[in-house]
Amino acid sequence: MNYYYGDKFSAVALSLKNGSRMWFILPDEGYTTADVLADGQYMQMVLQQDWENTKWMKVNLSVPKFDANSTINLKDGLQEMGVTDVFNELTSNFNEITGDVPIYLTAANQSVRVQIDEEGVKAAAYIEFPGATSPAPPEEIIDFILDRPFIFAITTDSIPLFMGTVNTP
């Protein structure tokens, strides 16, 4: 399993069945998840696969069961980017889809749910189970115990699909 060490945190990447990865990012003692998130180094690790600070090793991973969900209002952000007509009763135009039925949007929300338990990782509408890859024998064994607040991310091709924090493991 990949083990990454940064200035304020360490992390492991768990390979999922479809080639995605689930990252667990644990702040070092004396640092908080907010410290790690503010620094941004973790994002470089997730996006660029910073192999310089990565080791292949056997990891005894202990992850608590958790269920994280969030709903984000996208309407304000879309309007700030200039997407306004669809929210206006007089200017919206969905005729290609609805024919002559006039409709407009009153809201735009994104809901996300990530669950992890003994059976695997469930995110949004799909289920993934841990898979195994083994490029080389591990150098050493490390215990990686998520027993204090941590950050998680699910990525595909180094693109974050889901990210969140668990504050009470």
Model-derived features with residue positions:
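Mature hydrolase/peptidase catalytic cores and their serpin-fold inhibitory cores, especially
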Residues: 1-169
